[in-house]
Amino acid sequence: PANHPERYRIIYVPSVRLCAIQRWIHKNILSLLPSSCYSYAFDKNKSIKDCAERHMGCNWLIKVDVQNFFESITEDQVYFEFKKMGYAPLLSYELASLCTKERESPPYSKWTKYHYERVRTWNKIAQYQRTRKRFLPQGAPTSPLLSNLVMIPFDKKMGEIAQREGFVYTRYADDLYLSTANKNFNRKKALLIIKQIYDLLRAFKFKPNFAKTKISS
């Protein structure tokens, strides 16, 4: 229905000061890093056209949408991305905080639940204490490239599935595409592929948007 909540996207606009900081992080840190070879969104050297061209001449196309893509990416995932870049744990924590937004609800346990170095010490500092979970907000300048970084392991696994099944795989933000030129492929086999995609999404703490899954032939 037209008024269904999933038909709307919530865009979080950061304050002027925070936006300036996030733009700096985007320009001086995130934009310098390579993205997944399977990802075609948020990359100045790639486009939706390039993504579509990878599937030209296919006989079957499967499309799966990730539900609440940005909001499904958590502060701890962002923290580990900065840490993998070589930043110290505390600085990674600070950067992750700058790039994420606190959820309005529900409350959750503090950061002591996470196995971060020195996090128990940080929680003794008032401004580092957490009472609610944080997520990657759609609308922040840093969110697109951070989402691509977080998705690299997922893309790698999806690429392995695609290669094994004789498919081409691409991702454009929250849209996953798999195609094959195999004329002997059928809808029953497509449903088995989709199940593998759903299982992998769940393994990475994402949810598929069942209503947007499509099989085209």
What do these predicted regions represent?
Residues L18-S72, T100:
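Active-site-proximal segment of RNA-dependent polymerases
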Residues P5-Y8, R132:
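Active-site flanking loop/helix segments enriched in acidic
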Residues M56-A173, Y177-S216:
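Conserved polymerase palm-domain catalytic core
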Residues P1-A2:
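A structured, charge-rich N-terminal accessory region that forms the first stable segment of a protein
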